[in-house]
Amino acid sequence: MSIPQGLQERAAELRQLLNRAAHAYYVLDAPDLEDSVYDRLYRELLDLEAAHPELVEADSPTQRVGGSPAEGFRSVTHRIPLFSLDNAFSAEELRGWYTRLLKVLDREPPSGSPLPALAMVGELKIDGNALALSYDNGVLVRAATRGDGDQGEDITANVRTIASIPLRLHLDPPPAWVEVRGEALIPDNTFAAINSERAARDEPLFANPRNACAGTLRQLDPKVVAARRLDFFAYTLHLPEDWSGERPTSQWESLRWLEDAGFRVNPNAALLPDVDSVEQFFGDWDSRRHDLNYATDGVVVKLNDLRLQDAAGFTQKAPRWAIALKYPAEEAPSRLLKLTCQVGRTGVVTPVAEFEPVSLAGTSVSRATLHNADRLQELDLHSGDTIIVRKAGEIIPEVLRVLPELRPEGALPLELPQQCPSCGSDLVRESGEAATRCVNSSCPAILSGALRHWVSKGALDVDGLGSKLIEQLVERGLVRSIADLYRLDTALLTSLERMGEKSAGNLVAALAQSRTQPWSRQLYGLGIHHVGEVNAKALASAFADAHSLADAAVQRPEAITDLHGIGPEIAQSLQQWFNTSANQDLLQQLRAVGLTLAASDQERQALADRNNGKGHLNGQTFVLTGTLPSLSRSQAQALIEGAGGKVSGSVSKKTSFVVAGDEAGSKLDKANTLGVSVLDEAALMLLIQNSADTIHLL
């Protein structure tokens, strides 16, 4: 059954918005939304992908925990990964989680019987910044940001300035090592004092305590951190398996252990006997949260018994034994100022409402997406309308409703323009589609989007070519197609704003290097409608070059729909794309500047081996952990898969090898426990080269 085009476009939009938000939060250190916005948007994408698994793309934020560490601090690998939490937004979702937990624990009651009671701990979900603290022999040796869950940034010098974090544990004797997780924050009264001091110095004010805390933790000068008086609440404890001291057997005992060790634990945590008590605890704090001296955005619920936690285990992203129950999102009234439009890579025109700034959960909001013409018509927006804005379910907040009783006399209805705001071409809306599009292939906005997609991480992965530089290149007419990127030289680039000779040289080199990217990445980079990273890999595995793919798309579409996971909509999209003369010209231009648009000999051989089960690593499963000396994880994975192997995210008895680098985490410990062979990078390379008799096992 084909997926409605509107759902596919919505999923693509959600992926783009969520990934952009994650990049702003984790890499740029410039958060642009509150958690409730991200949570609801993430849930919408999760529901879409659950209903239509074909929508899952490799770049979907649901496939990962999170984002990459920013530059400027040393990257470190966490001894024990930091997982995300699944979210619930209602009592029904809370009970759904609890029912699933009972099923996993084989405690599901007979049909019609009441749910058995399991003790849980309710903790306030502090709206701060997660930290991972490492103690060796009782001494704080490292503090790191959460990062992507596996790797974070070493900010030990800054964290040492937080008075509520002990530099030495209050234990005698201490365990050989202790891992503590908790939340750094700036209390509201401290935040008010900081902003008052900044105002007196005529400095920009911080938007909210969370942003101020995040920026403070990444200050290069620890004296600045000390002056801002951060606080910390501990909530998770990890101890060595072989420690002979008194070991907590429950989450409640873990919190008491942390208190005894010298940590500040949030005093509002509660031991709750059943799920009804959890609902009462949540409702109580939902009404009382504004009385606290710090922000909270929900309640974290954890199964109390640690043995049951171990039995419940983890999904790929989150523990099954815990959930975050989130407070409802906020709403606020504002006055509509004007309607603007954005043009995306595929030509879709999205209306955006601009209104008087309002504060929602500590952030200033002045724009909200209206999605499409149907939503615009449904809201019946007029100039000057009073609107209700909500930060929920959207990265760019949404207009929830209009208050027509407050509409100014003579206000005119707002409609989508008939012409593209970027190029002036007539806009088109196909029958049955919600989207309105610009179909001018020379539209600057479409070209800019196509260029951003081509150089993105999942495609050609060109470092140093950001959105602002792309806009300059397009505005000056220096780049009129993707192929023109490969005609840029250092002299031309240095004529642009903020582009020095070194940066220009690096960009030219990065573009040259991108010519060697695999055929699947080149195919994905073309931006063909419906062809995401996963589909591009499937197509590239079946068709070794653009010529054979184009021939199949135009002459033999059944050869495409016969592929697993490739439906008629993708086949039709490919047929339309390859039949378009402008795209045929683009392929010729790309070949003229050195792009092969084909699999290399090595790729073809590896593909043939995999398809025939002849790869010498066929049937072998690998797990990667730690930082390898010269290979990134993606490079190591590509090499393993190229030789027929499979890469997994978790260690089990079925794992063939664990490849361990520096600061390998719990996966290495589990490999040793299970007796799984462990390789270093050199051994991996020898194994890939089919010299298994000489490999070095760690």
Curated annotation (Swiss-Prot):
The cross-references to InterPro entries, in alphabetical order and at most eight, read:
BRCT_dom, BRCT_dom_sf, DisA/LigA_HHH, DNA_ligase, DNA_ligase_CS, DNAligase_adenylation, DNAligase_N, Hlx-hairpin-Hlx_DNA-bd_motif
Positions annotated to bind NAD(+): D35, S36, V37, Y38, D39, S84, L85, E123, R146, E183, K302, K326
Tagged with keyword NAD: yes
Q: Report the EC code(s) recorded for this entry.
A: 6.5.1.2
Which GO biological process categories is it annotated with?
DNA repair; DNA replication
Output one GO MF annotation.
Answer: metal ion binding
Which cofactor is essential here? Answer: Mg(2+); Mn(2+)
What is the top-level taxon of the source organism? Bacteria
Where does the record place the BRCT domain? Answer: 612-698
Catalyzed chemical reaction(s): NAD(+) + (deoxyribonucleotide)n-3'-hydroxyl + 5'-phospho-(deoxyribonucleotide)m = (deoxyribonucleotide)n+m + AMP + beta-nicotinamide D-nucleotide
Catalytic site:
K125
Q: Where is the signal peptide?
A: none
Give the binding site residues for Zn(2+).
C420, C423, C438, C443
Which keywords does this chain's UniProt record carry? Answer: DNA damage, DNA repair, DNA replication, Ligase, Magnesium, Manganese, Metal-binding, NAD, Zinc
The answer to whether the entry has keyword Magnesium is yes
What are the GO cellular component annotations? cytosol
UniProt xrefs under NCBIfam families: dnlj, PRK07956.1
Which protein family is named in the record?
Belongs to the NAD-dependent DNA ligase family. LigA subfamily.
The entry's function note states: DNA ligase that catalyzes the formation of phosphodiester linkages between 5'-phosphoryl and 3'-hydroxyl groups in double-stranded DNA using NAD as a coenzyme and as the energy source for the reaction. It is essential for DNA replication and repair of damaged DNA.
PANTHER family listed in its UniProt record = CHROMOSOME TRANSMISSION FIDELITY FACTOR 18, DNA LIGASE
List the protein's name.
DNA ligase
- Recorded source organism is Synechococcus sp. (strain WH7803)
